[in-house]
């Protein structure tokens, strides 16, 4: 209901063209018949789908086909024929004829005939004294003439027998449901799993149940949330309406200042909103009670099908849950056995065969991936339309909620699928105008809602943090990442709990970086204030210890006792002391920021060479704000959000519509997803190192090609960082050797840096020199090993050893291929998802060169080999910065450098070098190396 609020409230101008919402609804209804991409592209295992038909469903389908054909004309149009039982599913229409000779039963005997255009003729009417089964028998097209003749011959030699007419499929289905009431919980859970119709919503429930730590933790959390809501509103009402503050100075008990029957004396507006809140509160309670049944079903799914009890759900990893989901999929591959015609329209995007770690992440983050891309491409205009704040961006949880309501609920339908109408350029203007109206309408709604939300959050923040700040004043200076920073740092297909873990690990490094910069004037003033406040506090504390009964009641100023000043000076001392940095801290802001980016994976190109500057610190400080400042910005955003919705966001409505059309791809069995979220594992996401500038053809045409490539690629290496981050979460934890070892990084396993870590000058020097070599754009050559693909999809070498990149949580078509990491001398194939997209640059490996190495010695790339024993042979320190993409281009390299790179890829050394390598490989018993 919330997702359709703006759609239903916006007026429709009947005097002009039809509303875009009417067009969207009509196109959604007709998309199952008109979307040629859905019909052609969705390819799912035909046998699994046909295997879902049961006997009673086949009988019901035949009966319905006979009834329908007897009442309709044989000259029915093809469009009307679609209203009958579905024929071949959309993803099997092309593969039926190819696989017909392999089936035991020919396609002519199946319910779903081959004819896509011609309707079925009415069945022949048998004599009345014949078997009743023949009345419901299929037409001649449902069986071959030979089988039909055998059937009639058998009927002539046997006594007619009136068999009971099969019940309608609805009654049989109802009886099957009634039988589930007496089944055991495991059978019930299996039946629900087999009849899942919307896999996106089901997997979302599975993930919410996982991060909620089980049924009882979720129930307790919901109860405490509604009780907290009731307490904040009730206590605020009591403080504002039931206390006579004029009597406080002259009263000694609470009863003297309480207003009797205060609710009867409340204003009409306060009474109305209190009743409105009461209705909302009881509605939430009723919703939670109704939702308990769904939680119970999810509890049974985890317990009986995944074998994960509530006692283990807090300790089991999500990767283990994904593995058990894949095992359950392999054990029960069929989709829902009985689905309606309406649901079969989009069943191609609900295939349970497409359910490995990559597909599950794409389903769970179908909408979030688009938001991540929007922030990465900087398409959203979030600047404040105020003269003195035009360069400042405003983004808060309130604005995030409005973006979901205005954009995502506009682009996606009720089933969570992207509306196909947004992929048509013909409706661009109407869709853009509809989005513009949604922004304006949401701004108007925020004006009426903002006062109540501001009051609630102010009271909630006051009740929650005042006592904490009063006891520990140093926490006033604590920081956290802003909502805008979270969307900039989050990667494609990165689930929330994995992202939250990665970001939490960066807090210590971020605090160290903020405290690194010289603030000598502030530090000197803070030390002076801390000294004065500490001296006064020590004297008062010592006097109160000597004679507490006399001195604690002593008034230093009018009505201000010693106890008051002890608390005041203690607070001032704590705040001033918190500003002064630790004396043992080592000053190295560049190294500290590199430690932060190792976790956040965020390092814009304009930061290059400026990590020590104050400009970079100011930019990072806007992403890592004080908690108090974030709260104040959240409150102020409720006031300024309508202006952003009215003036800033409508300017980018055209770009938003173009974005969803140009960055959406269709994946078989998965549906429409963001193009950046589809990782091409076989080609290493097509990420290749860029060519030097002087090797590129010059001219206007190539300049336009570069602009197009930049437009269709992610900024700041987001695509490659997401790819490696995904492999780190779902690939084996052991780091492989060879080319991939220098490209991947196990982010959560990095040690948290500290003062002891920085105090090692040797490690610091090696770390800095390695980063310098990386940032200077030195390309290291990589040897492409002779690889072959096993029948299970894992990449194996010539010796038969499995690829270290293979993962049990990825299907064979998603297994990463080491052959995808090629040298820049080899051309890369275009992506099958968007042929026009330019290949992304691949991150360069970090080449560690010994300091005592002579400059004249040429080390062949064949020395950096992939160990066949499976043990890691790569320095772990190389992985520390491997997630970055080197976007800089070396403009000083010449033709000799390119020739040298090609020679290195080929193995170097000419014919003698090749003979030497062949002898070496033969002696060591390995496959071809460096060929």
Swiss-Prot record:
UniProt superkingdom: Eukaryota
Main location: membrane
UniProt modification remark: Phosphorylated by ATG1. ATG1 phosphorylation is required for preautophagosome elongation.
Transmembrane segments: 215-235, 272-292, 528-548, 561-581
The keyword Methyltransferase belongs to this UniProt entry's keyword annotation: no
GO terms (BP aspect): autophagy of mitochondrion; lipid transport; piecemeal microautophagy of the nucleus; protein localization to phagophore assembly site; reticulophagy
Keyword list, A-Z: Autophagy, Cytoplasmic vesicle, Endoplasmic reticulum, Golgi apparatus, Lipid transport, Membrane, Phosphoprotein, Transmembrane, Transmembrane helix, Transport
Record field: catalytic activity: a 1,2-diacyl-sn-glycero-3-phosphocholine(in) = a 1,2-diacyl-sn-glycero-3-phosphocholine(out); a 1,2-diacyl-sn-glycero-3-phospho-L-serine(in) = a 1,2-diacyl-sn-glycero-3-phospho-L-serine(out); a 1,2-diacyl-sn-glycero-3-phosphoethanolamine(in) = a 1,2-diacyl-sn-glycero-3-phosphoethanolamine(out); a 1,2-diacyl-sn-glycero-3-phospho-(1D-myo-inositol-3-phosphate)(in) = a 1,2-diacyl-sn-glycero-3-phospho-(1D-myo-inositol-3-phosphate)(out)
Membrane topology term: Multi-pass membrane protein
Region feature (Disordered): 62-133, 734-780, 816-840, 854-879
One Pfam family in the UniProt entry: ATG9
Residues on Cytoplasmic side: 1-214, 293-438, 460-527, 582-627, 649-931
One GO CC term on file: endoplasmic reticulum membrane
Intramembrane residue ranges: 439-459, 628-648
Subcellular location: Preautophagosomal structure membrane; Cytoplasmic vesicle membrane; Golgi apparatus membrane; Endoplasmic reticulum membrane
Bias (Polar residues) ranges: 65-77, 740-749, 859-871
Lumenal-facing ranges: 236-271, 549-560
Domain remarks: Forms a homotrimer with a solvated central pore, which is connected laterally to the cytosol through the cavity within each protomer. Acts as a lipid scramblase that uses its central pore to function: the central pore opens laterally to accommodate lipid headgroups, thereby enabling lipid flipping and redistribution of lipids added to the outer leaflet of ATG9-containing vesicles, thereby enabling growth into autophagosomes.
Known function: Phospholipid scramblase involved in autophagy and cytoplasm to vacuole transport (Cvt) vesicle formation. Cycles between the preautophagosomal structure/phagophore assembly site (PAS) and the cytoplasmic vesicle pool and supplies membrane for the growing autophagosome. Lipid scramblase activity plays a key role in preautophagosomal structure/phagophore assembly by distributing the phospholipids that arrive through ATG2 from the cytoplasmic to the luminal leaflet of the bilayer, thereby driving autophagosomal membrane expansion. Required for mitophagy.
Family label: Belongs to the ATG9 family.
Complex and partners: Homotrimer; forms a homotrimer with a central pore that forms a path between the two membrane leaflets.
Name the UniProt record assigns to this protein: Autophagy-related protein 9
């Amino acid at each position: 209901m919330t997702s359709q609020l703006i759609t239903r409230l916006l007026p429709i101008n009947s005097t002009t063209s039809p509303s875009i919402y009417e067009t969207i609804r009509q196109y959604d209804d007709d998309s199952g018949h008109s979307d040629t991409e859905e019909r052609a592209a969705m390819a799912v295992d035909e046998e699994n789908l046909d295997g879902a038909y049961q006997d009673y469903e086949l009988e019901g389908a035949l009966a319905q086909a006979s009834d329908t054909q007897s009442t309709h004309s044989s000259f029915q149009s093809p469009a009307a024929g679609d209203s009958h039982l579905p024929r071949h599913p959309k993803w099997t229409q092309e593969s039926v004829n190819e696989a017909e000779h392999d089936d035991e039963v020919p396609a002519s005997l199946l319910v779903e005939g081959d004819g896509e255009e011609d309707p079925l003729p009415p069945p022949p009417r048998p004599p009345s004294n014949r078997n009743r089964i023949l009345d419901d028998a299929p037409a001649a097209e449902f069986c071959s003439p030979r089988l039909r003749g055998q059937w009639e011959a058998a009927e002539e030699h046997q006594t007619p027998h009136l068999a009971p007419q099969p019940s309608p499929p609805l009654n049989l289905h109802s009886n099957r449901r009634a039988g589930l009431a007496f089944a055991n919980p495991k059978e019930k859970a299996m039946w629900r799993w087999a009849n899942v119709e919307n896999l996106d919503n089901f997997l979302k429930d599975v993930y919410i149940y996982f991060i909620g730590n089980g049924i009882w933790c979720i129930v307790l959390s919901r109860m405490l949330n509604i009780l907290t809501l009731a307490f904040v509103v009730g206590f605020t009402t009591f403080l504002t309406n039931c206390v006579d503050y004029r009597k406080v100075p002259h009263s000694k008990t609470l009863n003297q200042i309480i207003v009797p029957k205060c609710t009867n004396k409340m204003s009409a507006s306060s009474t109305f909103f209190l009743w409105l809140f009461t209705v909302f509160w009881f509605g939430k309670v009723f919703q939670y009670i109704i939702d308990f049944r769904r939680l119970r079903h999810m509890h049974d799914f985890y317990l009986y099908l995944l074998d994960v009890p509530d006692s283990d759900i807090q300790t089991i990893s999500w990767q283990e849950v994904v593995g058990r989901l894949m095992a359950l999929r392999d054990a029960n591959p069929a989709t829902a056995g009985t689905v309606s015609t309406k649901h079969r329209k989009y069943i191609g995007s609900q295939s349970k065969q497409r359910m490995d770690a990559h597909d599950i992440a794409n389903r769970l983050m179908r909408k979030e991936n688009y938001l991540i891309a929007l922030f990465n491409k900087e398409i959203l205009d979030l600047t404040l339309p105020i003269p003195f704040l035009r360069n400042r961006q405003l983004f808060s949880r309130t604005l995030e909620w409005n973006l979901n309501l205005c954009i995502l609920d506009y682009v996606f339908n009720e089933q969570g699928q992207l509306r196909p109408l947004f992929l048509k350029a013909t409706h661009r203007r109407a869709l853009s105008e509809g989005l513009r109206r949604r922004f304006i309408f949401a701004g108007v709604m925020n004006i009426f809602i903002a006062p109540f939300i501001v009051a609630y959050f102010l009271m909630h923040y006051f009740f929650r943090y005042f006592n904490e700040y009063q006891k520990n004043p140093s926490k006033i200076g604590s920081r956290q990442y802003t909502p805008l920073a979270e969307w900039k740092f989050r990667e494609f297909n990165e689930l929330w709990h994995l992202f939250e873990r990665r970001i939490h690990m960066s807090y210590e490094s971020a605090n160290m970086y903020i405290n690194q910069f010289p603030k000598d004037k502030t530090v000197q003033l803070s030390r002076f204030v801390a000294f004065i406040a500490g001296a006064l506090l020590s004297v008062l504390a010592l006097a109160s210890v000597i004679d507490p009964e006399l001195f604690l009641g002593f008034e230093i100023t009018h009505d201000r006792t010693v106890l008051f000043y002890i608390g005041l000076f203690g607070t001032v001392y704590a705040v001033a002391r918190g500003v002064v940095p630790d004396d043992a801290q080592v000053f190295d802001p560049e190294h500290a920021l590199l430690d932060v980016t190792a976790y956040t994976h965020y390092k814009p190109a304009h930061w290059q060479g400026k990590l020590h500057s104050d400009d970079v610190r100011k930019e990072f400080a806007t992403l890592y704000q004080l908690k108090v400042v974030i709260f104040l910005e959240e409150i102020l955003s409720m006031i300024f959000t309508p202006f952003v919705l009215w003036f800033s966001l409508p300017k980018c409505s055209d770009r938003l519509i173009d974005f969803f059309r140009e960055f959406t791809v269709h994946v078989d069995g998965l549906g429409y997803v963001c193009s950046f979220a589809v990782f091409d594992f076989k080609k290493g996401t097509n990420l290749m190192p860029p060519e030097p500038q002087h090797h590129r053809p010059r001219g206007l045409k190539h300049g336009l090609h570069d602009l197009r490539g930049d437009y269709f690629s992610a900024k700041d290496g987001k695509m490659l960082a997401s790819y490696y981050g995904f492999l780190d979460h779902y690939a084996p934890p052991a780091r492989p050797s060879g080319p991939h070892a220098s490209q991947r990084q196990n982010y959560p396993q990095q040690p948290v840096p500290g003062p002891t870590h920085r105090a090692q000058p040797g490690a610091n020097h090696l770390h800095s020199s390695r980063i310098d070599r990386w940032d200077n754009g030195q390309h290291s050559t990589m040897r492409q090993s002779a690889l072959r693909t096993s029948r299970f999809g894992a990449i194996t070498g010539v010796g038969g050893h499995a690829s270290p990149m293979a993962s049990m949580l990825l299907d064979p078509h998603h297994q990463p291929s080491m052959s995808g990491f090629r040298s820049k001398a080899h051309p890369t194939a275009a992506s099958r998802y968007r042929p026009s997209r330019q290949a992304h640059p691949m991150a360069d490996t970090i080449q560690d060169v010994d300091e005592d190495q002579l400059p004249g010695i040429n080390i062949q790339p064949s020395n950096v080999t992939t160990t066949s024993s499976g043990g890691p042979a790569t320095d772990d320190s190389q992985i520390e910065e491997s997630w970055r993409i080197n976007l800089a281009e070396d403009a000083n390299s010449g033709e000799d450098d390119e020739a040298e790179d090609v020679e290195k890829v080929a193995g170097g050394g000419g014919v003698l070098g090749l003979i030497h390598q062949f002898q070496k490989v033969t002696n060591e018993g390995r496959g071809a190396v460096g060929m």
